Amino acid sequence: MQVGMQMRGGLTRIFGAALVAAAFAFGGTAPAAADGKMHIAFGDIATVESLNFLIAIERTKERGVDVEVTFFKSEDVAAQAVVGGQADIGVGTPYALIQKVKAPVRLFYQMSALRFFPIVNTEFYKSWKDLDGQEIAVHSRGSGTEAIMKLMAQKNGITYSNISYVPGSEVRAGALLQGNVKASIVDSTGKNMLEAKAPGKFLVLPMEGVNATDEALYANTEFLKAQAPAVEILVEELLKTWREINANPKVVADLRKKYNLLSDLPPELEGEVVPYYEGAVATKAFPSDGGGEAAVKDDFGFYALAGQIEGDPASLKVEDFWTFEPLQKALAKVGAQ
């Protein structure tokens, strides 16, 4: 597994003029992967949270597909690699890139839904209204965590004084625990850690009406056509792996050992593997059907409200952002759920 520049950046979203310019500079050339070969650009380091994906990749390899994964420092860099033809498949939700640049890229598999928890230090805040004029910390500019916090600010009629960018849910949880951050948003592992280490000190703020894609797979449309059989195998293995984990989250620990994944994982993090997946499964973070038109329309509503997609969500066309052909073919083989 080839490893590129590494930085915690699992939720960085594609947004901003700099990326648009970079995408034009790449020229949108189509990738030229060899038959049965794919290069996946992952905008993050390999962590406990990516084990399910790594397991599915190993199973794809077992079926004869030559898969290479490069871990980039952020999802925007990974997206540039896909647009420029240096990689075939990316991980993220590049709605803004597709809309602004008109890149020949389409999303084709929903890997996870946003499942995060806005959390505050109760010594200072106890409600959304208390955050009016206050500073918060999110993962990164344009990220799903930022989108959630901006959306909740709109819903509650408040304005933050500043948004700080602190990559990594575990880093933000640590900053909350140390008192360096007073309001942030974390994943289930971070929430559980805070509740265990400081009972009663932190409060999860209510969050209704948030249902959107966290991570999805996307690729150049020419690659999807040229390598349709290999892509179909990947999607089949993703579906089967997700369903196995949803049925029994503990299996992730066994499969990690079977495929020798994250062999250098620190001992203190090994104990987080099963709890993380149990928490994610409990919140239905991993769709068993790979997404669909209903999920995409949820994305349109969410990311439009958060300012990351332009236009009336009702007027946006699913086919301008997604293709479901690989998923439909895979579902025909493994069955729908």
Short names for language-model regions:
Residues 297-337:
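Conserved C-terminal helix/tail region of periplasmic/extracytoplasmic solute-binding proteins
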Residues 94-95, 171-264:
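Pocket-lining segment of extracytoplasmic ligand-binding domains
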Residues 63-65, 156, 197, 259, ...:
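Residues at alpha-helix termini
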Residues 15-27:
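Bacterial N-terminal signal peptides
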Residues 226-310:
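Secondary-structure end/capping motifs
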Residues 28-34:
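Sec/Tat signal peptide C-region and signal peptidase I cleavage site
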